[in-house]
Structures are given as C-alpha cells and as structure tokens.
Amino acid sequence: MKLNKRAAPWIAAIASLAMLAACSKKEDTTTVAKVAEQAASDVKAKAEAAAKEAEALKKEAEALVLATEAYVYGYPLVTMEMTRRIMTNVEQPEGNRGPMGQFIRARTYPDAKFRDVTAPNADTLYTTAWFDLSKEPWIISVPDMKGRYFLLPMLDGWTDVFQVPGKRTTGTGAQTFAITGPGWSGELPKGVTEYKSPTSLVWLLGRIYSTGTPEDYKAVHALQDKMTAVPLSSWGKPYTPEPGKVDPAIDMKTAVREQVDKLDANAYFKLLAELMKTNPPNADDAPMVAKLAQIGIVPGQDFDPSKLDPAVVKGMAKAPKPAQEQIMAWLKEGVVAGDFKVENGWAFTTKAGTYGTSYLQRALVTAIGLGANRPQDAIYPTSTGPDLVKKYDGSKKYVMRFEKGQTPPVDGFWSLTMYDKDYFFVDNPLNRYTLSQRNKFKTNADGSVDLYIQAESPGKDKESNWLPAPKDEFVLMMRLYWPKEKPPSLIDGSWKIPEVKEVS
C-alpha cells in the first residue's frame, strides 16, 4: 500500500512519539523501583536502629540492676577505706586520728563535732588502730584490765568481726595476740595467739568502759597507754613507729558517709576493684562475684569502663542513687525479711557483726553504725519514730518510762543515745549525748524512771533524766553491751523495750 506523501511525516512523528512514550514508561518504572528500594532500605535501617536502641536500653537496664547490686555489695569495703583514709591521714596520733599501725587513744568521749564515724558512742573510750597485713602480721599486747569491761573487736575490710578478745571471751588478764593476713604462714613468738584476718585491711575498734569522771578517765588512760602494736619483724626489739604520711588531697572535714555517697559510679567502682585486690571476697560471695564480672568488676583487676559497652557504662552511671535508697530502705524492709525485729517503735537486729551474704543488712549497718559488734557483745535497738513511720520531731516532747526493776538486762552496760537524722551527736548546753546506768536518775514514787526526750529543759528538778534533742528530726539508739541471754533478756524476748510516748 502506497502512503500519501503528505501522511508520511505524520506517521513518522507518531512512531517517534510512541517510541518516546515507551522509553518514558520504562524510566518511570525504574524510578518507582528505585524509590521502593530506598523506602525498603529506610524501613530496614529504622528497624535495625530501633532494634539496636532496644538492645542498648536492655543492656542499660540490666547494667543498672547489676551495678546497683554491686554498689550495695561493695559499700562496706569502700566505706571502710574512706574511713581509714581520714582517720590515718596524720603524722602522729592526735585526737581521734593516728597513722597506720599506731593506736588512736580517745581520752574523752566524742562530742557533737565528731564526724569520722556514724553513730559514735559516749559510753566507752575508743582505743583503735588500722593495720595493713599485706606485708606481715602485727602483734598486739594488752595489759591486765583489772576486771574492767572491754572488748577489742577486729573488723576485716568488709566489716565482718572475725575475732573479739575482751572480758566476755578471753577475760581481763594480760594477753598478747597476732593478727595475720590472708595467705600468711609462718611462726609466731611463744605465747602469742594467732587471729587470722580474711583481708589485708583490719580495723581494731577497741572499747574500754568508763564512767566519764576525771578519776575514771585517768584510770582508763593508764590502761590505754600500756596497749602496744608492733610488726612481727620488730617483736622483741626496740621499736619506734614511723611518722605517718599526710595526703593533702584527702578531705578531712566532710563526713565519710557523705564522701562515699558523692562518689560517681566510675570512681566508686574503680576504688572497689582496687580494694578487692588485697581484700578478696569470701567464698560464699561467688554468685555475686560472677555478677560483678558482667559489668567489668573482677577481683585482682583494674576497673576500666572504656572496655565496656557504652550502654553498660550508661546504666552503671545511674546506680549510686537507687543503691543508696535501697540501703536506707532496708531498715523497714529488713523487718519483713526477718533481719530486724520491731517492738514498741524500736527496730533491732541480732544479725550484725557477721553478715554472710546479707549484703543489704551489711550495707545498712555500715551506713548507720559502722563498727557494729556481734550480738553476743552488743545489740543496738534503734528508733526513728514512735511507730517507724512517723518521725520524731524535736518541736515535740517525749517520755520513755522504765518500770521499777525493768532497766535493760545486761552483763556489761546499757545506754540511750540521741542522734540527729544523720546519726551524729546533737550539740546541747549540757554536752550530754546519752543517758545510761551511770546516771543518777530521779525516780517516781512507784520506783519507775521517766526519761525526758525533748529540745528544751524539762526543768532543773528533772534535768538528771533529760536527754537533749535537736529542734528537728532525730534518732534514738540504745546500746545493750553483753546482753543477758537468759530471762529477762532482749534476745529471747522475755524483756521488752519501753515505747517512747509523745506528751502534751
């Protein structure tokens, strides 16, 4: 068929347009495919990012849980070290401080300015010393105490009391013993008793009872001065302790607990890991040690957060605050767990001094009463308010009554101590921080004794029975040293602690 010459150009144009349309359609299909491919890639990337974020959040949350447990676990060891630093950062013994390996002989009771240890007592004169057993043992000599009540509990780095020479256990005669560290083996001089410590760090926290009079202080000072400590290599030789080395970087003013609580997670766990090199965990701590390893805390090794997943480090950084809250909450939660008993607003425990794997219990005692004894030596009933929910308020007045013949049953001594909310003494015009069996109380007509707990004096005629309180929140702590184990006894429940009642 012959095409009209005029139609030929049109046909060619139409063919060209058809070809162009076909090419355009092909390009559109390619573009759509690319867009779809990019969208799929974006969705995949977002999904992967979300998965990574979810995984990071999971790691962070898991690390927070583990780090919180680790913080609680290590709290006693870190607190012991911070306490040691402050108490030994002097050239010579002075006041409540002294170099490593030298006795610190408290000549009077602590006062309201004392901030080295929480919950100090005003019943005994402390005779204490810090020892590093990593190089060699130390030998301690104690004079004849002439029947006076005393005890020399030794705390390892984790605050467990591993030995308690004293009137209850070894009598009051002269005695000599050696404190040896982990892994030490060798011979000791004849007549020297060995007390083996599980850790290189040891705090001998001796207490000698005193009535607080000038005459009795003098008698106790004479006994303190006869107590000696020498390294094994110097036994039987003339020995003069070297002056301590003062580190100006150590904060000597801020309370230990406050310093510990202010440590960030990185500093805290680095210190914990360093201390664990010479203060190894107990065998029973194996499950906890395995948990610590998951967040880079391994006994004998440095803690290096740069080797950890950033999400883990982020989770660990959040641990201090919830851990501190858990520790303080244990005063109430421990009642449910059976670690504390509650009577008439008083909480007390017979699970102190040795803790096993009760890490929260150990941390709480460290926080509010570092240096606590075994229950056979002392029980510390504590009350933060009439019912453990409502707090004591210094703007109000309270009375604690002992019925006739119902003062605390002990073979040692008892006392009632006033603390502020941070467990330190309260400044007052009488410089009185405790009431105890050494006080001459005014009795009621029926033979009972009322103790007045308030900020203002109850009147001159009642001041003998007055325990001064601050104007705000406060805490009461009783001490029953060498508590009776047979009726009447706090231990078996045959004696009850009187309640503290608010009065108008």
Located regions from the model:
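A compositional/structural signature for long, glycine/proline-rich flexible linkers
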Residues: 35-504
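Bacterial signal peptide processing site
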Residues: 23-26
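Bacterial N-terminal signal peptides that target proteins for export
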Residues: 2-11
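A periodicity- and composition-biased signal for non-globular, repetitive helical segments
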Residues: 11-12, 368
